[in-house]
Structure formats: structure tokens, C-alpha cells
Amino acid sequence: MYEASALPRPLVGGVVSGRRRSLQLVLAGIWLLDGVLQFQPAMFTKNFAQMVVYPTIAGNPSVIASPMTWAHGIMLNHPVGTNTAFACIQLALGLAIAYRPTTKLGLAASIPWSIAVWWFGEGLGGVLSGGADPLTGAPGAVILYALLAVLLWPADEGDRSAAAPFEAAGFIGAHAARALWLVLWSSFVYFTFASGNDAPGALDDQVTSMADGEPAWLAWIINHAANLTDGRDLAISVVLGVLFAGIAVSVYLPWTRVRRAWLVLALVLCAVIWVVVQAFGGVFLGMATDPNTGPLLALLALVYWPVRTAGPARP
């Protein structure tokens, strides 16, 4: 018979392991960072609507582009009011997720907000416009916030979250969590070649362009990385495709050490892409709305990190 002190202590809003709670706090921190970035002076001008939002409209079907054009008009005509609202909402989401009694409320509210921003602010990440590229942030950073909100949802006391093979399976189950991982990383394989990065000079030009306006030390790193890609566009695209495919299926492998090795590879790959191709999300340029997909994909990898279980995984 177990002593009461040995049992997991139910927390407000669901049973949350220390690991799961830490991951929730990281997600909250990224939301807070987004709110702070939204308060940059340039965001309160028409440049935000014209330079950040407007380019995402091009190429989308009219059913997607028309509402985006309408939303763009509102942001263009009321830059201060709309941006203040955006910044405050994101700060509120971060604080709500970080404060344990309102964690569920914050996660729940972040899902529709993320979907709205993904549509009206990111043009669905370029998925329908032909501009989706996993190196530059496809399928859109903000949709990953919604995914993480679902995967990090506090498990109710009746759920067998203690038996989950990784934190992502604690609420929705292992089968659903693995399927989401597979779909996301498999899409990277498709978009790697659909984006045209395998064309001669495409990847080199893309990486080189990211150095514009960046601090000298970061521009040096990016330019040297661009030199390494010169003439190797197809080869690098093939390697990336193979790595993305391996990461996609790795969650189905029966060997824990092998799964962890693939997740480490995913973390390293995310870090390289975040620095070299995404330039830390452009946070040094004064108009970044988020740190891009690099940190979010890294957090996602940690959410899928294998843990010791007390029993069979929940399907």
C-alpha cells in the first residue's frame, strides 16, 4: 500500500509533472517574448502592416486572401490600436500559461489566437501560396504554438499521463501524438523540394539574403555558411530531406536510445537553421514578431523526449 506522500499530488487545472510544467513555462516565456517584440517602435507604424503582413497575402486563394486583405486594411488604418491589442493579448497569454491556476485558460485561448494569426498574419505559412519553406519558417511559427498548447495540455486526474512514453502523449495519447509529429516533419520533406531550394544558387541566395541588416558577428556567420552552400543546393536539399524523413519516423522506433539520438539530431538541426537561415528570427532588425520556428521545434522535440513510464502507453 502506498503512502499518501508517495502519490502524485493533483495540481490546480490537472495533474502536471515537473517536466511537463517546465515545458509549459518555456512556452509561456516564448509568448511573453512575442509580446515584448510586438512593442517595438516600428510595430506601431504602418510599416508593420505593409512590410510584415501584406507580403503574406500574395499567392493565396481568394477565399484566404480576401479576409487577409480586410484585416490588413484595419491594421494599416489603425496601427497603434491594433498593435497595442496584439502585444497585450500575447503578454496575457504568456502570463496565463505561466500562472498555474490559469494555465488551462491560457493554453485554450492561445489556440484560436494562434490560428487567427496564422491566417491573417502569416497567410497560413505559405502552405497554399507555394512559398512554404521549412528553412525560413514553414508551416508558420504561430501554428506551432497551437500544436504545443494541445500537446502540453494538463492531463486530468483520470488520464494515465504517468504511463505516457513522452510528455506529448500525456493528454491526447501516444498514437495521436506520434501521428502529429509524423505529419509535421513529413511536410518538411515535401516543402524542402517544393520550395525550389534544390535549384542552382537558390539556397545560397536565400542564406546570403539573411545577413542583410544583421549585426556584424551574425552576418559573418551567415555569410560563411552561405559560402559552404555554394553549388551544393541539390545535395543539401537531399540531405535535409533524408534527415527530415528520419526525424519524422523516429517516434515509431522501438529503441529508446535511437529515438533520443534522432531527437538530439532534430535539436541540432533546429539550432543550425535558426542561426544560419532564420537569423534568430530577425529579432535584431526591429520588426520581428516572434523568434521563428527554430525554438518552437526545439521545444517540440523536448516534448517528445522519451521518459520512463510506470506502465503501458495510452493509445
What do the predicted segments below correspond to?
Residues 1-92, 99-315:
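Extended, low-polarity transmembrane helix blocks
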